Design a protein with these regions (language model features):
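SIR2/sirtuin-family catalytic core signature
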Residues: 6, 10, 17-22, 40-46, ...
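Metal-dependent phosphoesterase signature
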Residues: 1-5
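Class I SAM-dependent methyltransferase SAM-binding "motif I" and its flanking Rossmann-like core
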Residues: 73-82, 86
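Residues at the C-termini of beta-strands that transition into short coil/loop
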Residues: 54, 77-80, 179-181
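Basic- and aromatic-enriched surface patches that contact anionic nucleotides/nucleic acids
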Residues: 25
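Active-site glycine-rich loop that binds ribose-phosphate moieties when present
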Residues: 52-61, 89-108
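Active-site glycine-centered loops adjacent to acidic/histidine catalytic or metal-binding residues
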Residues: 28
Length: 186
């Protein structure tokens, strides 16, 4: 996979064109987002900074978001590598999520940025409970607590998940749901 030359999906190319976005958190282990950003912003030059989380080696942002010199793609669930340091199963997901909640294994600068900035979760295929857990981890407080920033979920299934919708309507009024990742970036 590391040497494969697949083209990034059109939705990622469109997302990469939004130059106000400089910090991307990916839950996939592929390099499509990196390729799209490099193609759209740097004429294909390898200029995007790539960081991959691993429970056995915490990698954090090099600096606060406002001081980033170039776009960053942070692979929250790992990235393709020779060693098994990326998520490919439900058990892997569980281990990564548990590690991310551990005081000593949390990328602090990244989670500070997630806590104090608006979030766009686009195209994820997280289950109902994983969406809830990710939002809670990112915001570092109860979702029902008042906050100045909101979240947008743009995917193919969250809007039709009645239990997730009921939960978000009850406790997270700042979260907005849009149907379809590709339609959202159009």
């Amino acid at each position: 996979l590391r040497d494969a030359t697949f083209a990034p999906p059109r939705a990622l190319t469109q997302l990469a064109q939004i130059t106000d976005f400089d910090l991307f958190v990916s839950t996939t282990f592929d390099s499509f987002l990196e390729q799209a950003i490099n193609a759209e912003r740097f004429q294909g030059a390898q200029s995007t900074e790539i960081i991959g989380y691993s429970p056995n080696r915490v990698a954090d942002l090099p600096t606060e978001r406002e001081n980033l010199q170039r776009p960053v793609v942070y692979h929250l669930l790992g990235r393709v590598s020779a060693s098994p340091t990326y998520v490919i199963s439900d058990e892997d997901t569980l281990e990564f999520v548990c590690a991310l909640q551990s005081e000593h294994l949390t990328p602090e600068k990244l989670f500070h940025e997630l806590e104090y900035n608006h979030l766009l979760l686009i195209g994820s295929n997280f289950s109902n409970w994983l969406v809830r857990l990710f939002l809670r981890m990112a915001k570092r407080r109860r979702l029902s607590d008042p906050r100045d920033v909101g979240e947008v979920l743009a995917d193919d299934h969250s809007g039709s998940d009645e239990r997730l919708m009921a939960f978000l309507q009850q406790v997270s009024l700042r979260t907005r749901i849009y149907s379809g990742a590709e339609g959202f970036v159009d």
